[in-house]
């Protein structure tokens, strides 16, 4: 059972409300974040370590945040939605204030 005090659950729910998601959509967002963050409900970086990640074709745009956003194109798209340069500052995706709307808007709008 997901606890509301686990990690950033309350922030994610508040972000879902801000963008008018239904209860069913919010449940889906929470379940996705729970799975993608290894049950922490905190932004995480793709597992594997730097040496492993540098071998990925999408380096340095590796999975970050609540949904493990990857690839430069997706960093650009998320940046345009939020008005933030994630391409030059990929580490910002580890901040909840950016990771939450990326999670919610990405699932709502694609």
Model-based region annotation:
Residues 1-11, 23-109:
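Peptidoglycan-targeting cell-wall enzymes and recognition modules
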Residues 15-18:
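Extended, non-catalytic subsegments within catalytic or DNA/protein-binding/adaptor domains
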């Amino acid at each position: 059972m997901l606890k509301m005090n686990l990690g950033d659950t309350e922030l994610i729910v508040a972000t879902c409300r801000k963008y008018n998601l239904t209860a069913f959509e919010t449940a889906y967002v929470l379940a996705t974040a729970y799975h993608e963050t290894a049950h922490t409900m905190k932004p995480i970086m793709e597992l594997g370590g730097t040496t492993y990640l540098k071998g990925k074709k999408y380096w340095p745009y590796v999975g970050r945040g609540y949904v493990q956003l990857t690839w430069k194109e997706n960093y650009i798209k998320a940046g345009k939605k939020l008005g933030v340069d994630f391409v030059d500052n990929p580490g910002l995706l580890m901040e909840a204030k950016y990771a939450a709307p990326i999670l919610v808007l990405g699932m709502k709008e694609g």
